[in-house]
Amino acid sequence: MRLARRLKWDWLDTDNEVERRAGRTIKEIFATDGEATFRQLERDVIADLATRDRLVLSTGGGAILNADSRRDLRAAGPVVWLMASVQTIGSRILQDASTISRRPNLTATGGIAEIREVLNIREPLYRECATIIVNTEGLKLTEVVAKVLEELPANLLQESHS
């Protein structure tokens, strides 16, 4: 959201949009309809939103599991991977009450073991999809935003101020 504010662009979160369209939380979708249904809803949201101009689109970590979503995200503009260690991701999840209440377990293990397991699958896809990688370890949010802005193509920054 802060990046969008700096660019003077709109901001949307795919998880929020899935919940809005479904009228249920992600946890409820997983519990009643399963992960495949959630991933299809997520895919539909990305397909709809990736065509919008001047939009910072925040996705859940699993959005890149779908090849069509990866293609659409890359075609839409720069894709930023906010990289962090397993421990940092775990700490951030525990510090965010909204994430704790909305996020279902993705494996039988949960916790740090789950994060490690999921990252082993997703990291190659993040690398494939990302045009910009920012290591967020030890950085404040304002520093992360500054690093992303440094890496964005100049033409995008010029467009944001016109």
Regions found by a protein language model. Give the residues of each.
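Glycine-rich phosphate-binding loop of ATP-dependent small-molecule kinases
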Residues: M1-E28, R52, P78, P153-S162
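A glycine- and Lys/Arg-enriched "phosphate-lid" helix/loop adjacent to the NTP-binding pocket
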Residues: A75-E123
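Short glycine-rich anion-binding loops that position phosphate/pyrophosphate groups of nucleotides
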Residues: G61-A63, S85-Q87, L139
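Short amphipathic alpha-helical segments
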Residues: M1, D68-R71, S91-Q95, A146-K147
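ATP-dependent small-molecule kinase phosphotransfer cores
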Residues: L12-R74, Q95, T99, L106
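NTP-dependent small-molecule kinase module
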Residues: R6, P78, S91, N120-S162
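Structural signal for short hydrophobic segments within the conserved structured cores
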Residues: D10-L12, P104, I132-V134
